[in-house]
Regions:
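Residues on the lipid-exposed face of transmembrane beta-strands in outer-membrane beta-barrel proteins
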Residues: 46-50, 66-72, 84-90, 103, ...
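Extracellular loop and loop/strand-boundary signature of outer-membrane beta-barrel proteins
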Residues: 52-54, 87-89, 118-123, 156-160, ...
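Transmembrane beta-strand segments that form the barrel wall of outer-membrane beta-barrel proteins
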Residues: 44-52, 76-86, 117-121, 149-160
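Residues that define the transmembrane beta-barrel architecture of outer-membrane proteins
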Residues: 40, 60-66, 97, 126-132, ...
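Flexible, solvent-exposed coil segments and beta strand-coil junctions
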Residues: 44-49, 69, 111-117, 148-155, ...
Length: 286
């Protein structure tokens, strides 16, 4: 089951979304639907995303996106945002409850390049940051019917380059269900919490920045950064998720900025606390 979810989630994480497909006439999904993923596998995906120019911007840009997921000797390695994560806990065959735990590394490039907003672009550019931490979770399968699942995940990351001392805590709960031999959809709700160092780096406006841009000075504080709702789905192009091959899918995400992320003049005066992301793409399973 985790392998089926992995394929649809990977398709969606690189932007592969389609409208939710209707159930097949018989409404059933075979128990062996993930048989193509017994043993080792590799999923690669690439696509295009439509995302805010910076965190809090109301200007949007198209950008390339990509992702991967692999299973090697019961160890899973996967893309995590712009980064990589791993799960070192093997899944017991046939178990309804499954656990995940491993390291995660992420790259964050907020306001590091050219900014479209003519005022925010006058602020000093930020350096890209590297975040290192731990990710873990638990999932329960066969909730409402055979093959669906509910998962709870938590992640803690610390910045080790670009802005030392920052800490980010992310949690989410998700639900996934296959719709047929070829399609599956999922949804998730999540929140992020940041400490003062992280908030200050990304959302404060210094006296120097205020003089250059005309924005008021602002001192950011730690706390809740955002709440996020996400809908994703994937579809196998030959109509059978069991045999690998090509698939398409995508994701629609709505993020509501909170605390300093919403109150900073970069958001409150020049942007929007409502952040959308839409992505579409293509993936291949080996």
């Amino acid at each position: 089951m985790h392998r089926l979810i992995a394929r649809v989630a990977l398709f969606s994480s690189v932007g592969c979304a389609l409208p939710a497909l209707a159930n097949e006439a018989d409404g059933t999904v075979p128990r062996d639907i993930d048989s193509a993923f017994d043993g080792d596998y590799l999923i690669l995906g690439a696509g295009v995303g439509y995302a805010p120019d910076y965190n809090g911007s109301d200007d949007y840009t198209l950008r390339p996106i990509g992702g991967f997921r692999a299973s090697i000797s019961d160890m899973r390695i996967f893309s995590s945002g712009v980064g990589i994560g791993a799960d070192f806990i093997p899944d017991a065959k046939g178990a309804r409850v499954k656990f995940a735990l491993g390291p995660v590394v992420r790259y964050r490039a907020n306001r590091t390049g050219k900014v479209r907003d003519e005022v925010v672009r006058l602020l000093p550019r930020l350096k890209a940051t590297w975040e290192v931490g731990v990710t873990g979770g638990v999932s329960l399968e066969d909730i409402f019917h055979s093959r669906d699942s509910v998962s709870v995940r938590a992640e803690v990351r610390w910045t080790v380059a670009g802005n030392q001392g920052a800490r980010i805590i992310s949690t989410d709960v998700s639900y996934f269900t296959p719709l047929s031999r070829a399609a599956g959809i999922g949804a998730s709700l999540g929140v992020d919490y940041i400490n003062r160092d992280c908030a200050d780096y990304h959302y404060s406006v210094s006296a120097q920045g205020a003089a250059a841009s005309g924005l008021p000075t602002y001192q950011a504080h730690g706390g809740w950064k955002n709440s996020t709702a996400r809908l994703y789905g994937g579809y196998d192009l030959d109509g059978n998720l069991r045999n690998g091959g090509w698939g398409i899918g995508g994701v629609v995400s709505f993020e509501r900025l909170l605390g300093s992320a919403a109150q900073t003049p970069m958001t409150a005066l020049r942007g929007s606390r409502d952040q959308w992301f839409v992505g579409f793409g293509l993936g291949y399973t080996f």
